[in-house]
Amino acid sequence: MIFPQAMSRGLARGLAGVLLLAFGAHGYARGESSVWSMKGERNTVYLAGSVHALPKDHAEFPEQLERAYKAANIIVLEVDLDDMNPLDAVKFISTNGTLPADKSLKDVVGAEPYQRVAALAASLDVPETVIAKLEPWAAALVLTQFALNKTGFDANLGIDMQITERARTDGKPVEGLETVIDQLSVFDNRSFEEQTRFLLDSADDAPKLTEDLQKLIAAWRAGNLRALEKEFLKERKKSPELYDALLGVRNRQWLPKIEALLKGDQDYLVVVGALHFVGRDGLLSLLRRDGHKAVAVPAAKPPR
């Protein structure tokens, strides 16, 4: 299957945003911080929760993140976007996310659920032929990306892309915790049953995507992880296996890599999706469980 080039860029650059949107995030109240610091023997490691897609009128860095970026010598992201070939994601989906010749998405998910998915595709101006032969996970990512495009939120304005561009300009090295193929494999390795739940949840959530993103950004800017965690745990109940694969497993894979940074002599800024910090399997809990003290970086001035 050949994907349009625009879809190639969207899937590759916006994938982290789609991962973040795999579960809804709602709620807003004043909170603590979305940036933390940990002291190594000879360095400081900053941890920052990010939002991977932002609107043009609300794309500025929170003040704590701005300070952490300036203090860091090396940047660590989920994926090193400069080291990524956008076509790798498209090739992976074409190879691994396409159903056999004798199967269709309708066969896999059932006639009635498929009609819901097809109706969403039509509302997003996505030809049905684009999704008809995709596995459920791939169809979900494609439709979520098109839905994201219609909200006015742009992955190119997300914190990851902004930091990548600034680091390039400032000459700061950028490293990745994983690859885009690692991220896509999380979905590809799920059963069709789990994939179908993910697809249908994505279809149900699409109409309120703009509202959900606005609430997510408000909570993120306020550093209100408690509000995110409360709603996220409710969403987790819908698909605990996928939740663990998307966040818990990846957090545990990242943990030793982040802990190794504390043994260096350079200051690091680690930036990953905000939802990776919430819950018992969140990075903050895992790090504290291993004896590391992560201290919230306070705002220099009250939020507006």
Q: Where do the PLM segments sit?
A:
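Bacterial N-terminal signal peptides
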Residues: 12-25
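Structured, acidic catalytic/metal-binding patches in enzyme active sites
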Residues: 30-246
